């Protein structure tokens, strides 16, 4: 499609006049900011506090040492499953297999 320069100029003038002057201003072209709406989900955590004392989150919030301690040897762990795995290992692998389970606790040091 070949248009002459006068036809292109006419289309530009018509296009510019199609909108009111206020719509051509920069302020009218910028959309207004909108606040995001909170999700209406029953299990939503919006506004809920995070339990920073959870063993997996303690390092993230400033505690750089594991807090769950083996009551038998004093070795510290980040979570209870790691402690239980440690207890079930043979002594040559760093565990306490064969020791009474009562002697092992997951008390947090004070």
Curated annotation (Swiss-Prot):
Q: Where does this one sit in the cell?
A: Secreted; Host nucleus
Question: Recorded GO terms, molecular function?
Answer: DNA-binding transcription repressor activity, RNA polymerase II-specific; RNA polymerase II core promoter sequence-specific DNA binding; zinc ion binding
Give the record's keywords alphabetically: Host nucleus, Metal-binding, Repressor, Secreted, Signal, Transcription, Transcription regulation, Virulence, Zinc, Zinc-finger
One GO CC term, this protein: host cell nucleus
Tell me which positions the record assigns to the signal sequence.
1-18
Q: What induces it?
A: Expressed during multiple stages of host plant infection, including prepenetration, early biotrophy, late biotrophy, transition and necrotrophy.
Q: Name one GO biological process term.
A: effector-mediated suppression of host innate immune response
| Disrupted-gene phenotype | Does not affect vegetative growth, conidiation, conidial germination, nor appressorium formation, but leads to significantly reduced virulence to rice.
Zinc fingers (C2H2-type): which spans? Answer: 68-96
Q: Where is this region: Disordered?
A: 88-110
Q: Where is the composition biased (Basic and acidic residues)?
A: 100-110
The UniProt function text for this chain reads:
Secreted effector that translocates into the nuclei of host cells to reprogram the expression of immunity-associated genes by binding to effector binding elements (EBEs) in rice. Binds the 5'-CCACCTCC-3' EBE of promoters from targeted rice genes and probably recruits a yet to be determined host repressor. Causes ambivalent immunity with increased susceptibility to the hemibiotrophic pathogens Magnaporthe oryzae and Xanthomonas oryzae pv. oryzae, but enhances resistance to Cochliobolus miyabeanus, a necrotrophic pathogen.
Q: Identify this protein by name.
A: Host transcription reprogramming factor 2
Supply the source organism for this entry: Pyricularia oryzae (strain 70-15 / ATCC MYA-4617 / FGSC 8958) (Rice blast fungus)
Task: Identify the coding gene.
Answer: HTR2
């Amino acid at each position: 499609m070949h248009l002459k320069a006068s036809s292109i100029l006419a289309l530009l003038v018509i296009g510019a006049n199609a909108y009111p002057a206020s719509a051509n201003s920069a302020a009218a072209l910028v959309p207004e900011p909108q606040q995001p709406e909170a999700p209406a989900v029953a299990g939503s955590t919006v506004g809920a506090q995070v339990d920073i004392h959870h063993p997996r989150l303690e390092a993230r919030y400033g505690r750089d040492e594991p807090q769950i301690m083996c009551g038998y040897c004093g070795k510290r762990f980040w979570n209870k499953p790691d402690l239980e795995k440690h207890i079930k290992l043979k002594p040559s692998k760093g565990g306490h297999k064969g020791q009474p389970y009562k002697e092992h606790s997951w008390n947090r040091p004070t």
